[in-house]
């Protein structure tokens, strides 16, 4: 479970992150990263904030929940790699349904590396 200080808590935070942030995709996930979350009172103290989007295209409810749990553990383990004021949305793609936790971790890390090169 993500601690509340590391969760995106409302639709405005998701919307701003997806629309204003940078994006990097891999085969199983798309990472939306918004480093300037301090604009418009979006950021609060406590470190980076994460949100997950796992749509019905990924699979049935059991599959979506499993993918969500895997991604939650991946982002919490990587939280120190993100600036404290950043917002991150991880969107799962249909291939995430059959990916292992290690594959998801590798794809999130590769997307983060790509975003770091863009900055």
Curated annotation (Swiss-Prot):
Top-rank lineage group of the source organism: Bacteria
Primary enzyme class: hydrolase
A GO CC annotation given for this chain: ribonuclease P complex
GO MF term (any one): 3'-tRNA processing endoribonuclease activity
TM stretches of this protein: none
Pfam families the UniProt entry points to: Ribonuclease_P (PF00825)
Keyword Nuclease applies: yes
InterPro entries: Ribosomal_Su5_D2-typ_SF, Ribsml_uS5_D2-typ_fold_subgr, RNase_P
Keywords on record: Endonuclease, Hydrolase, Nuclease, RNA-binding, tRNA processing
A GO biological process held by the record: tRNA 5'-leader removal
Record field: catalytic activity: Endonucleolytic cleavage of RNA, removing 5'-extranucleotides from tRNA precursor
EC number(s) given by UniProt: 3.1.26.5
The protein's assembly and partners: Consists of a catalytic RNA component (M1 or rnpB) and a protein subunit.
Alphabetical list of HAMAP family matching this protein: RNase_P
Family recorded in the similarity comment: Belongs to the RnpA family.
Record's function text: RNaseP catalyzes the removal of the 5'-leader sequence from pre-tRNA to produce the mature 5'-terminus. It can also cleave other RNA substrates such as 4.5S RNA. The protein component plays an auxiliary but essential role in vivo by binding to the 5'-leader sequence and broadening the substrate specificity of the ribozyme.
Protein name (database record): Ribonuclease P protein component
Taxonomic lineage: Bacteria, Bacillati, Actinomycetota, Actinomycetes, Mycobacteriales
